[in-house]
Amino acid sequence: MNKQEEENYNSSSYYYFFLDKMIHNIKFRAFVYEGEDIGEISQAILNILPEAEIEAEEAEGLMEDKIIILSGVISKKRYTKAFFNKLLELDTDKLNTDLERKIDNKGNWFLRFSKNDAFNEKWTIIDSGDSIHLKIKIAAYPARKEIAIDKIRVVFN
């Protein structure tokens, strides 16, 4: 990105236009294991993505235990923009540092939020464990890792 493009990105009106076009969609998924409350896990998802329409699907685990998979997609721009604005309130230095390993070659950004913290209305990004999985499709043309990373870093800076 050249100096002029960066100046344009940082100007207020262009910044909001840019942010509005930043994300194509957000796919989410969480597993509800035996002993967990489906209502609590659904609420945890809604605390991160308030407009989510959650679908439930039953599955069977490795030990033949019952698992419910909660999933869905957020595509409306006002909702993806609201999510990204809230994400900017988190530790953007850490998010920025993790971009290389959390974005795939097609421009998908993978984040995981703690289910327990999300239920308590706290956004905690984690690398493993019991979590809400997000797959965020960054609007990068062409859809490549480097372009997606550059777009996100412009907003972080």
Task: Indicate residue ranges for each PLM-predicted region.
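Long, hydrophobic N-terminal alpha-helical segment
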Residues: 2, 9, 14-55
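Short, conserved charged micro-motifs
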Residues: 37-40, 78-84, 144-147
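Short amphipathic alpha-helices in soluble, non-transmembrane regions
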Residues: 41-44, 83-90, 150-153
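A common structural junction motif
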Residues: 48-53, 90-94, 129-133, 155-157
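Short, charge-patterned binding micro-sites
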Residues: 55-79
